Amino acid sequence: MDNKKNIIVGTAGHIDHGKTTLIRALTGRNTDRLKEEQNRGISIELGFTHFDLNNNLRVGIIDVPGHEKFIKNMLSGVCGMDMIILVVAADEGIMAQTKEHLDILNLIGIKNGIIALTKCDLVDKEWTELVKLDIADEVKGTFLEAAKIIEISSTEKKGIDNLKDEIIRIVDTLPEKDLNSNPRLYVDRSFSITGFGTVVTGTLISGTLNLDEEILIYPSNKLTKVRNLQVHDNNVNIAYAGQRVAINLANVKKEDVPKGSVLVPSNTFTESSLID
């Protein structure tokens, strides 16, 4: 087993407030995958990457789209997140999708987070303090009420080390991942690769998932097998709860396992139309 502790951090916030740029400053990678995203300068699909903090911690990053038209894509990525970085640009402050993302995260029960005040190099100190007061007022009564607000300039790399330190501090308070329950994965991407077939990605919520394991797809009730298994672009024989996982599935079409599907071992879960 990989000795590193695995956690998932998501971003949230209004369009063009610097989520993708912040992640590039943290990881050195660009999470805008699609040509359309590169051309338009906005995130449409979920973006994924990772980086290591010290010798013991691997942080998976989910970069969610901020534009209102792509809010359903944002929703598909929030399952399995250990914490959120709410990104607010200092030159604009709280905006429509900031509030919308905050409401969604609060409703689904996210418990931990950090507020990244980006683009601080574009405004003076007095304006920064006013925006921080506005943010504090907006997050009152939410899971971010006591969250630290970290001033950042991604282009100048200012505040990045402070952000990493706060991630480590929060991780130290998180419970250990549940490796003993049945594996469960919510699909947030589904696509086909020529020569390989259907591939899905998601965060493994609980348990462990093995190469060649037989699993069931809900709600399509299709039985399939794990043909290939990757964690952070590396082929593995077993994946553990808390890891970002890509799975090559045998004998199913991508239409059989759309975004939002759940992968579990057969005869372990039951479908329901009720929510408690």
Which ranges hold each PLM region?
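Conserved Switch II/interswitch segment of TRAFAC-class P-loop GTPases
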Residues: L57-R58, V64-K69, C79-L130
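ATP-binding Walker
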Residues: H17, P65, K158
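Short, ordered loop/turn segments at secondary-structure junctions
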Residues: H14, H67, A89-G93, T118-L122, ...
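Conserved catalytic-core segments of large NTP-driven translation/proteostasis enzymes
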Residues: D137-D276
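Residue-level signature of catalytic and energy-coupling elements of molecular machines
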Residues: D16, L22, G41, I61-D63, ...
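Conserved G1/Walker A P-loop phosphate-binding module
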Residues: M1-I61
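Alpha-helical scaffold elements adjacent to nucleotide-binding pockets in ATP/GTP-utilizing enzyme cores
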Residues: L22-A25, Q97-I104, L130-E138, N162-I170
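Signal for well-folded cores of large energy- and translation-related assemblies
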Residues: T27, T31, K35, N39, ...
